[in-house]
């Protein structure tokens, strides 16, 4: 029989030299396989005297256990090294520049609405909202709009039936707010409105902000002062403003507000006036005790003037080349 110490020494050296799991398995077969060195040693026990056979068998089994232990340890070592190499190959290189995530921006119409809300909020005006599908009372009757007014025709208003329609202004919010409370009132009502019109300066849906203040001893001079300050704040410069007499069914007296452009021409930007007594009566407010003023402005129109946009329809076409300019 080959000396066991020599077999173990050779096995130990070959196990340590095995550089892969495949090579290690070849070593295992060489020593523990059917024709392996230690297997042959066991098969040779029959040639020994009975007195030597038992001791030799114990030594051979001990040698097998030693080799199996060495094989197991080397296998664990190789598997760990293989895993570490794989992880190293998959490691993210943090020194590489990352992909830039492009931030979005507020739509220019949203920017304008927020700017308006901020200005009037600092003056104590709350922000109110209401339904976009409105009934005839809140959209027309309570606002002193006569039955034969052009706004009541299909050419200007989207009707569902004679009493339900898409609101043509946010004035209905003013009526609902006054119905649900008691004077004094001080609020603005921004929102989407709908009119049957579409061209370079009109779209079927657009945004309005209407405002109202109702209290005792409210006068036109207060209205003029607030709107002048608002326009100067909005355009971020001192602007020349004029109030031109006009007519609105829900205000008396009424005026349209113009600003003077740099080329000397006047441009209309909003409408306003003192709340008509009939409007106050429609919501149960005594016009002998209370008075008020109201104003309304088209958000897209103000946005066009502020940013120099010529076509209102550009705000709704979702052209990123256009919208990215307002980030």
UniProtKB/Swiss-Prot annotation:
Enzyme class: ligase
Protein name: Phenylalanine--tRNA ligase alpha subunit
Subunit structure and binding partners: Tetramer of two alpha and two beta subunits.
Textual note on the cofactor: Binds 2 magnesium ions per tetramer.
Location relative to the cell: Cytoplasm
The gene coding this protein: pheS
Annotated Mg(2+) binding sites: 252
Signal peptide start and end residues: none
Co-factor(s): Mg(2+)
NCBIfam families hit by this protein: pheS
Organism per entry: Aliivibrio salmonicida (strain LFI1238) (Vibrio salmonicida (strain LFI1238))
InterPro entries recorded: aa-tRNA-synth_II, aa-tRNA-synth_II/BPL/LPL, Phe-tRNA-synth_IIc_asu, Phe-tRNA_ligase_II_N, Phe_tRNA_ligase_alpha1_bac, Phenylalanyl-tRNA_Synthase, tRNA-bd_arm
PANTHER family linked to this entry: PHENYLALANINE--TRNA LIGASE, MITOCHONDRIAL (PTHR11538:SF41), PHENYLALANYL-TRNA SYNTHETASE (PTHR11538)
Record-listed E.C. numbers: 6.1.1.20
GO CC entries: cytoplasm
Catalytic reaction(s) noted: tRNA(Phe) + L-phenylalanine + ATP = L-phenylalanyl-tRNA(Phe) + AMP + diphosphate + H(+)
Entry keywords, A to Z: Aminoacyl-tRNA synthetase, ATP-binding, Cytoplasm, Ligase, Magnesium, Metal-binding, Nucleotide-binding, Protein biosynthesis
CDD domains: PheRS_alpha_core
GO MF term list: ATP binding; magnesium ion binding; phenylalanine-tRNA ligase activity; tRNA binding
UniProt record similarity statement: Belongs to the class-II aminoacyl-tRNA synthetase family. Phe-tRNA synthetase alpha subunit type 1 subfamily.
Protein's UniProt keywords contain Metal-binding: yes
Gene3D superfamilies for this protein: Bira Bifunctional Protein, Domain 2 (3.30.930.10)
A GO biological process held by the record: phenylalanyl-tRNA aminoacylation
Main location: cytoplasm
